[in-house]
A protein has these predicted regions:
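Short, linear, compositionally biased motifs with a strong N-terminal bias
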Residues: 11-12
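Bacterial N-terminal signal peptides that target proteins for export
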Residues: 1-8
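Conserved functional acidic sites
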Residues: 22-258
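C-terminal motif of bacterial Sec signal peptides marking the signal peptidase cleavage site
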Residues: 17-20
Length: 258
């Protein structure tokens, strides 16, 4: 599902930033709920309002399933991500289970219907998410959006998960018992080093049980900075019902704007 690769790519061009908050209250989610489900044929569509790119666009993710990728010499779970932007098109993402966390491989492409890595090296985000996401977890990771190409920047991130007592409302519906992840991101190297200016961002991501990511908000600077990016779920298609978008226990019937 869409996370922050597109945001990172946009921000490095304009050198901009993102935010978070905390929650308290009783959390009633099923302890066995999956907050990042990746079942074959699941589909998510998001609308993206990007002030840094000065654009609004849609992103659709579809789970293809487990595949062996000869070019990378590994087996992973493949998700296809489609951006309705010029020169964007369809891109594969691969998820790997490693040490209790998911590793996310992106920056990949299709060449004659086969997954290939770019010449400059793929983007690899270890410790992307815990395999079993729960509130009150903390972890850190480092992201290389353009691989380890000389002159490229990197992002050091610290994450903490919280229970979300309030319903989360997006175009796809109202979702209860969500988990919110607050991420503090420090951008350095590459263009930031050349301008002698590092960048500190904060992200908030909301995950709904058995649905996955339903909203991301990015703010410039710290938690009180101006909003720069907003990503919201407009359509979710579960494996059991591919004919129409569905949402699990929601207080309002889902809408289907995309």
């Amino acid at each position: 599902m869409i996370k922050r690769m597109a945001i990172a790519a946009a921000l490095v061009m304009g050198v901009v930033s993102v935010s978070g908050c905390k929650s308290a209250g009783e959390w009633k989610a099923d302890p066995n709920a999956d907050f990042f489900p990746l079942k074959t044929d699941m589909v998510w569509t998001y609308r993206v309002n990007s002030k840094s790119q000065r654009a609004n666009y849609a992103v659709t993710d579809r789970v293809i399933g487990m595949q062996y990728v000869p070019a990378l010499k590994l087996t992973g779970l493949v998700v296809e991500e489609f951006y309705n932007l010029d020169r964007a098109g369809l891109r594969p993402i691969i998820y790997l289970d490693q040490g209790g966390f998911l590793t996310r491989l992106s920056g990949l492409d299709y060449v004659e219907h086969r997954i290939q890595g770019p010449a400059w090296g793929r983007s690899e985000e270890q410790n992307f998410l815990p395999e079993h996401l729960t509130p009150d977890r903390e972890w850190k990771n480092t992201l290389f959006p353009y691989g380890k190409l000389p002159g490229s920047f990197d992002v050091t991130q610290s994450h903490k998960s919280y229970m979300e007592p309030a319903d989360v409302t997006v175009p796809a519906g109202h979702f209860r018992n969500c988990i919110r992840i607050e991420t503090r991101a420090h951008y350095e190297g590459g263009a930031y080093a050349q301008q002698k200016q590092n960048l500190n961002l904060t992200y908030e991501d909301w995950y709904a049980p058995n649905v996955g990511l339903v909203r991301t908000v990015a703010y410039q600077g710290g938690p009180n900075g101006p909003e720069m990016e907003r990503v919201e779920l407009t359509r979710f298609e579960a494996v059991s019902d591919k004919a129409a978008p569905v949402t699990p226990p929601a207080t309002v019937p889902p809408q289907t704007n995309s």
